[in-house]
Amino acid sequence: MNADAEGHSGAVVPAQSPEGSSAADDFVPSALGTREHWDAVYERELRTFQEYGDTGEIWFGEESMNRLIRWMQKHKIPLDASVLDIGTGNGVFLVELVKHGFSNITGIDYSPSAIKLSASILEKEGLSNINLKVEDFLNPSTKLSGFHVCVDKGTYDAISLNPDNAIEKRKQYVMSLSRVLEVKGFFLITSCNWTKAELLDAFSEGFELFEELPTPKFSFGGRSGNTVAALVFQKRGTSLDKIS
């Protein structure tokens, strides 16, 4: 049930455009952007895990997780830095973070079934020191704050497909990110629905591009592009403090 090694898990229809074109005007509202859809998905995956031990899909594949962890190691993100996984789903990325030594990890999802699934998988792995919370990232609790690193692998994509005013929800996402991420903190996003240029525009208020991560390329009809966009943003601010 896992996704391919790179690219797409099958949960969100890819809308990456070749260079020079935009997918922003091509989105069609979809049930894939609704809470009801994801509740149903994770209720089904929870039953499957309980019956067969199958953890479910790995969002964008294992390589997407490895890419993010390699970046964190390359830039010497402290192992005790606070990390937030936005839309954690089955929590498999949380498991990988722990395996690589990270110890201050929080996973959130607005689907209670997703959090139940994550908790079951973490219990099977013998992990009890990870924070799991049912949280709507568009309306986060006041306790959700002060993170050094925030990670998104598909949640912003899903929000973009919401039938109920997706444009405003994307703006609210950026506001929420600004609230929960510390000044000079890092935001790592992987998207199949948005190009680099579109993500730069979406997160231009309060964030700056720190690095673009390499992802597989494709070519079609003489034009080229990436199967996914993977970017690292840093939150702007006046503080000169680094993660410590």
UniProtKB/Swiss-Prot annotation:
Source superkingdom: Eukaryota
Coiled-coil boundaries: none
Enzyme superclass (EC): transferase
Keywords, comma-separated and alphabetical: Cytoplasm, Methyltransferase, Nucleus, Phosphoprotein, S-adenosyl-L-methionine, Transferase
GO MF term list: methyltransferase activity; protein-lysine N-methyltransferase activity
GO cellular-component term (any): nucleoplasm
Primary location class: cytoplasm
Function: Protein-lysine methyltransferase that selectively catalyzes the trimethylation of EEF1A at 'Lys-318'.
Catalytic activities: L-lysyl-[protein] + 3 S-adenosyl-L-methionine = N(6),N(6),N(6)-trimethyl-L-lysyl-[protein] + 3 S-adenosyl-L-homocysteine + 3 H(+)
Protein name: EEF1A lysine methyltransferase 2
InterPro entries: Efm4/METTL10 (IPR026635), Methyltranfer_dom (IPR025714), SAM-dependent_MTases_sf (IPR029063)
Keyword ATP-binding attributed: no
Phosphoserine modification, residue list: 21
Keyword field contains 4Fe-4S: no
Localisation: Cytoplasm; Nucleus
GO annotation, biological process: peptidyl-lysine methylation
EC numbers: 2.1.1.-
Family statement drawn from the similarity comment of this UniProt entry: Belongs to the class I-like SAM-binding methyltransferase superfamily. EFM4 family.
Region feature Disordered, mapped onto this chain: 1-27
Pfam families per UniProt: Methyltransf_31
HAMAP family membership: Methyltr_EFM4
